[in-house]
């Protein structure tokens, strides 16, 4: 019954609020189509004009796009720029007393940072990194920090002196942190003693200590610690230094480093299907331009707006839409420490009311959880300040979309259901709030200048209603530049599978359907990546972790639909020596495997279901048929070709076990 209602609701068209559309930057579909036409007519001129108008340059670029070494594209060649200057200094003339950041801690503390204050703190932090830690242009700095204002200072300080930051999500394990430190060959690691979560101290420094123990990260010279929750922690003499004790001795004047357009801005590690995380490398100018443009187009950001993106800075959404995008626009961005549920499920709605939030951007997982746990909470608060709502990280189901639209947006706010990736830097497909007629759960249309198409494996376009591979067929400024230290993997991952007009195109790894109006609906991953609560987790790294359990001979992990998280993890496990386990033992084994996952990856990786099987379905070449296992996990009919299987009986045995467990 609910499915039928969802399907019917998903067909409805919602036009932009007329009053909002009148004052929007892009007011209707004609204006959208004009921009698309302009970009198509002269692609390089379109992007070059935007870069000249929107960014402040120390030296103008002399070439918009260099494709000579494709797919290693270069944008705005030979231009000189600094990202921190564009996010802070250029606003000081007219906006020095404007609020740049509003911070609210979980324990009720808050802080308001003006652009003048931000300038001072970033400069002092930059001088600290230079003078006391010898951080120079091109050095890598790992930031393992919670959602506090000092995290933003660290990011911008790195950009000011030309260091490359790599933020590691504060929920990741010491092992995951160690892997990223070593891959980046980081010189300095910055962390906090801890933070607050669900009303209690949550410690980070012990994880760093474990990551660095026994000289496991030889590139690291020192660690810088921000005191946040003031709990007692251990210090390593000569290695660990306290930020709070040192920063105020530094000058608040620091000239920004002149950076080339293509100089790396940051590395951000994302899950790869091979198990080893990929260090996605983004450039300075191209990334920042698109961060600013998508803020202006997709959120229609205005001078007096309070913008709140709930993402953690450890993810690309936090980079682009908590920090760089809002600050490049001279807007006010909100930062929240802790969870949505503490002290209760009304916390986010109280924040919107108290800080008069205009544009609100969050994940479908959060929406589903708030709907399930606190459906009536929004009615207790005044949410009339909201003008645009946004979703990110995964497809949103119609039921959650409907609740978000009606109960949070009061049926008057456009929902911008954005599709993009760590690798794209910013939005690729999204409605425009003043122009695009929207449908529930539909990403709608590519943004101007973006050539996103749904293709078959042979490079032909799919017919309306047919599922295909979502590709981007022309380079764009904010695209990934490389995988750190692994050019071959960069090409193999993104530019080696589908050709259009004889040239390889960017393969997103997502499946999609385009309708007769050109609207694109995202289906989900087509590779071995599972999207859990908006976090991309590689099944290979999950399998590698749980295989470390002494009772596990081999395993295969697939993603299955989850009402709250979007996708959950389902493991098919073969026990050593054909061992079997009863219900109690199987539950204990599940608990132990999840403990291993929390250590190896972090608490975001957790098995929801396990099926103990005698073997795994493999082709004669030894490849596990995960699509077949996914069908079994989802209780769908088996439609895959079984002729290449080494042993068809394995499938029959697994299906028999599945039927018994129903």
UniProtKB/Swiss-Prot annotation:
Gene3D superfamilies per UniProt: 3.30.300.30, N-terminal domain of ligase-like
Ubl conjugation listed as a keyword: no
Binding locations of ATP: 393-395, 417-422, 510, 525, 536
Taxonomy, superkingdom: Bacteria
Residues with N6-acetyllysine modification: 623
Top class in the EC scheme: ligase
Any one GO cellular component localisation term in the record: cytosol
UniProt entry keywords in alphabetical sequence: Acetylation, ATP-binding, Ligase, Magnesium, Metal-binding, Nucleotide-binding
Binding site for Mg(2+): 549, 552
GO MF, one annotated term: ATP binding
Binding locations of CoA: 197-200, 317, 533
Cofactors (names): Mg(2+)
PROSITE patterns: AMP_BINDING
EC number(s) given by UniProt: 6.2.1.1
GO biological process: acetyl-CoA biosynthetic process; acetyl-CoA biosynthetic process from acetate
Catalytic activity: acetate + ATP + CoA = acetyl-CoA + AMP + diphosphate
SUPFAM superfamilies noted in UniProt: Acetyl-CoA synthetase-like
Post-translational modification: Acetylated. Deacetylation by the SIR2-homolog deacetylase activates the enzyme.
Chain segments annotated as transmembrane: none
Role noted for this protein: Catalyzes the conversion of acetate into acetyl-CoA (AcCoA), an essential intermediate at the junction of anabolic and catabolic pathways. AcsA undergoes a two-step reaction. In the first half reaction, AcsA combines acetate with ATP to form acetyl-adenylate (AcAMP) intermediate. In the second half reaction, it can then transfer the acetyl group from AcAMP to the sulfhydryl group of CoA, forming the product AcCoA.
Other facts: There is no ortholog for acsA in strain J99.
Family: Belongs to the ATP-dependent AMP-binding enzyme family.
Protein name, UniProt field: Acetyl-coenzyme A synthetase
Organism: Helicobacter pylori (strain ATCC 700392 / 26695) (Campylobacter pylori)
């Amino acid at each position: 019954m609910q499915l039928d209602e969802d399907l019917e609701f998903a067909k409805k068209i919602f036009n932009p609020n007329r009053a909002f559309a009148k004052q929007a930057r892009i007011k209707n579909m004609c204006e959208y189509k004009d921009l698309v036409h302009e970009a198509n007519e002269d692609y390089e001129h379109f992007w070059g004009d935007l870069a000249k108008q929107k960014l402040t340059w120390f030296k103008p670029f002399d070439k918009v796009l260099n494709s000579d070494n494709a797919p290693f594209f270069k944008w705005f060649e030979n231009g000189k720029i600094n990202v921190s200057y564009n996010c802070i200094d250029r606003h000081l003339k007219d906006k020095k007393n404007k609020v740049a950041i509003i911070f609210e801690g979980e324990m009720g503390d808050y802080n308001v940072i003006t652009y003048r204050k931000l300038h001072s703190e970033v400069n002092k932090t930059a001088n600290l990194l230079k003078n006391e830690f010898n951080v120079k242009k091109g050095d890598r700095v790992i930031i393992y920090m919670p959602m506090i204002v000092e995290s933003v200072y660290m990011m911008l300080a790195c950009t000011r002196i030309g260091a490359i930051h790599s933020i590691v999500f504060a929920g990741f394990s010491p092992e995951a942190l160690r892997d990223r430190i070593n891959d980046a060959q980081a010189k300095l690691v910055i962390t906090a003693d801890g933070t607050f979560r669900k009303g209690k101290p949550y410690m980070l420094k012990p994880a760093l200590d474990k990551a660095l123990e026994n000289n496991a990260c030889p590139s690291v010279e020192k660690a810088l610690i921000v005191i946040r929750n003031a709990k007692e922690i251990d210090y390593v003499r000569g290695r660990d230094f306290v930020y709070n004790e040192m920063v105020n001795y530094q000058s608040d004047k620091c000239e920004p480093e002149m950076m080339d357009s293509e100089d790396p801005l940051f590395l951000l590690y994302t899950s790869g299907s091979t198990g080893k995380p990929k260090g996605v490398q983004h450039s300075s100018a191209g990334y920042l331009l698109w961060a600013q443009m998508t803020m202006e187009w997709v959120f229609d950001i205005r001078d007096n707006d309070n913008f709140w993106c709930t993402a953690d800075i450890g993810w690309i959404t936090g980079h682009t839409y908590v920090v760089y995008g809002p600050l490049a626009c001279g807007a006010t961005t909100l930062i929240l420490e802790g969870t949505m549920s503490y002290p209760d499920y009304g916390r986010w709605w109280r924040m919107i009311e108290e800080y008069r939030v205009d544009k609100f951007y969050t994940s479908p997982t959060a929406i589903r959880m708030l709907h399930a746990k606190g459906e009536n909470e929004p009615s207790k608060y005044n949410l009339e300040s909201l003008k645009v709502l946004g979703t990110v990280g995964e497809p949103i189901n119609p039921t959650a979309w409907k609740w978000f639209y009606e109960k949070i947006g009061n049926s008057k706010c456009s929902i911008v259901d954005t599709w993009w990736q760590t690798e794209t830097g910013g939005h690729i497909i999204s409605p425009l709030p003043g122009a695009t007629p929207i449908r529930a759960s539909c990403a709608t249309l590519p943004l101007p200048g973006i050539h996103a198409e749904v293709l078959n494996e042979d490079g032909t376009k799919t017919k309306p209603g047919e599922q295909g591979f979502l590709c981007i067929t022309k380079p764009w400024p904010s695209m990934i530049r490389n995988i750190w230290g692994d050019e071959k993997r960069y090409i193999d991952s993104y530019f080696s599978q589908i050709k259009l007009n004889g040239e390889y195109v960017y393969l997103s790894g997502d499946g999609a359907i385009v309708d007769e109006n050109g609207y694109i609906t995202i289906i989900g991953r087509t590779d071995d990546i599972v999207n859990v609560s908006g976090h991309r987790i590689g099944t290979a790294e999950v399998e590698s972790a749980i295989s470390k359990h002494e009772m596990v001979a081999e395993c295969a992990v697939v993603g299955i639909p989850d009402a709250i998280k979007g996708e959950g993890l389902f493991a098919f496990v073969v026990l050593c020596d054909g061992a079997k386990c009863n219900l109690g033992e199987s539950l204990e084994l599940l608990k132990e495997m999840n403990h291993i996952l929390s250590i190896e990856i972090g608490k975001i990786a957790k098995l929801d279901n396990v099926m103990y099987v005698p073997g795994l379905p493999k082709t004669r070449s030894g490849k596990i048929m995960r699509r077949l296992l996914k069908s079994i996990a989802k209780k769908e009919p088996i439609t895959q070709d079984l002729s290449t299987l080494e042993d068809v009986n394995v499938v029959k045995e697994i299906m028999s076990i599945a039927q018994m467990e129903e």
